[in-house]
Amino acid sequence: LNHPNWSMGAKITIDSATLFNKGLEVMEAKWLFDVDYDQIEVLIHPESILHSAVEFEDTSVIGQMGTPDMRLAIQYALTYPQRKKLVNGKSLDLTQLGSLTFKKPDFNRFHALSLAYRAGKTGGSLPCVLNGANEMANLLFREGKIEFLQIEELVEKAMNAHELVKDPTIDQLLDIDQWARDFVLKEINETCRRL
């Protein structure tokens, strides 16, 4: 498993392919920047150069661009508000970029992104179910026990089966996370028995 632009592990590579990672980032942005989900737009950007952008009331846009290197974001989070030289970092050469491509995601093709928006907008315990079920389904895929498209199918089944808790405690969230993981395993075991 290799992402075309980013150097990352197998789990996040799968989450990137399904767009579950993008869905989780949408939820993060909602809480970090105190904005509504309708104000957050996801774009498919194959070159992985523009990492985020903010549109202001006057319609001007400020974006954060750089080479696809997660070390930069991690370093900045650790050294904020200072910016430090990135060891072995590669500068972005704008003259070599050519063109940048942006597309709206197909929410039918990337159903995981729809599930993440649904979980985020519903709130309560549903984002925890989405995350726990995805963690288990992703693992099962990497172990060769399910097909790629079953990842989002299993997550959706877990979300549909879950009884929402509006204001869960930390202990409840831990239990719900385990429930979601167990639900996915149970679904796979029942499917195998039927075959």
Predicted regions located by residue number:
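Catalytic, metal-anchored helix/loop core of enzyme active sites in primary metabolism
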Residues: L1-L195
